[in-house]
Amino acid sequence: MIVVYSKPACVQCVATTREMDKRGIPYEYIDLTKDQDAMATVRDLGYMQAPVVVAGDEHWAGFRPDKIMKLDTAMEPA
């Protein structure tokens, strides 16, 4: 399961979810302004900016089309 920790009115967050939607990548969206436990999780991972994307053992912050493309490629059937 891919999780996108996000905030409203965050340009990089919108770009991230838009790119994932365009590629048909399923994800769970968590609003950091409404979930203090999620905010603690993001901080524990070492991030101070949104979005934070967690995909299995991999995670990153910011809009990363290169990482999103790798997720898309990993989901393609062999």
Which ranges hold each PLM region?
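Local sequence-structure signature of Cys/Sec-based thiol-disulfide redox active-site neighborhoods
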Residues: M1-I25
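Thiol-based oxidoreductase modules, predominantly thioredoxin-like and allied folds used
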Residues: I25-A38, Y47-Q49
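ATP/adenylate-binding site constellation spanning eukaryotic-like Ser/Thr protein kinases
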Residues: K7, Y47, P65
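C-terminal basic regulatory modules in eukaryotic proteins
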Residues: K67-A78
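Short alpha-helical
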Residues: V11-Q12, Q36-D37, D66
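A short, hydrophobic beta-strand/beta-hairpin element that forms part of a small beta-sheet core
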Residues: A50-A61
